[in-house]
Amino acid sequence: MKATKVKFYHKGDTLVYNADAFQLAEGSMLDALIRQLPGAELRKDGQIYVNGKFVDNLLLNGKDFFRGDNTVMLENLPNYMVSSINVYDKLGKNSKFAGYEMADDKQYVMDVKLKKQYSIGWTGNVEGGGGTKERYLGRFFAMRFTDHSRLAIYGNANNLNDSRKPGENDNWSPSNLGGGLKEQQFGGIDYFIDDRNGKYNLDGNVQVKHQETTSITHTNRKNFLSGGDTYERMVNSNRNQELIFNTSHRLYFEGKNINLELLPKINFHKFDNTTNYSSLSLSKDFASFGKKQLDSLFSMNLGKELLNFAINRNLQNGKLKGHTLETSISANSVIKFKNSPDNINLYADASYRDAKEEHFDHN
């Protein structure tokens, strides 16, 4: 007889997965482990479901990690560091401070617990690769742990159009792959500082992403007509550039009878999109002309040989550029009264938005 490890069990209202009970390929990250968890489902963009219920937040040792972007932890945390994965309903800080569950202050979370030997120290990984047609991938991840703080940094640069991985549960068709070439560079920093006495904590993250997508579509068509065949060539090119900057932070302070939480955020998105369209109809096959003549299709002055057989021509150029800036800060506080179950809840927020868009067309 051969003993097998228990893969999961319930501890009160918490569902606990034993990470060591799952066999994974060497070098696997957290995402590969979660895909094997019974009842768990990993979907596009890092969304996680357990027994059909959406997981609101993915935690690391009970703390936020790149809040709102699960993919950073999923793709960079080695599975061998994980001791267990706990799934449960977590009350917010205000509920814990007040001593009872407050409205809209509970989340369904997946909490990744690290093994003791990895709870203090450095960890990191680096990956690089290349392929045909000048495809490449390079990324790194490093993290520093102590019993009351954490600092993580990551970066990624690639021109891989398809970011899916084997085993993802996702509906896919060839149209999802997209056309053209997508180049992207992104990175970020995440930090957490916790007071040993639990009176305050500070956490936040900064992420930057640059992305450029270029696509060119060529279409050739022959029309069979009684009065003589005609030939058409159409070229459509697009270049889309984006710069995205996101940062969010949280400061929490807790006194004897009052607490305070501040949540500042900044989101910035800059875009620059260019479109060029050229089409030409001839009474003679395009194969009859040389490269120099055919290249003139993209210029204002059409080649003389093409001009002699031209039926109609269309040139269109477009440009769309602009930006969006959104900033906000919110504050909430709970004030307790001595020898009374009552309390006062205070909330305030302020926000600012600036957007600009310019559109140019030329025919």
In which residue ranges do the predicted regions lie?
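Extracytoplasmic
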Residues: 12-14, 43-45, 53-55, 80-82, ...
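Soluble non-cytosolic domains of exported or imported proteins
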Residues: 24-28
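Extracytoplasmic beta-strand/coil segments of soluble accessory domains associated
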Residues: 31-66, 84, 94-104
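Short acidic/polar hinge/loop motifs at secondary-structure boundaries
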Residues: 63-92, 147
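Primarily recognizes Gram-negative and organellar outer-membrane beta-barrels
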Residues: 68-71, 91-134, 148-363
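Short, acidic, small-residue-rich periplasmic hinge/interaction motif at the N-terminus
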Residues: 1-23, 43-45, 51-55, 89, ...
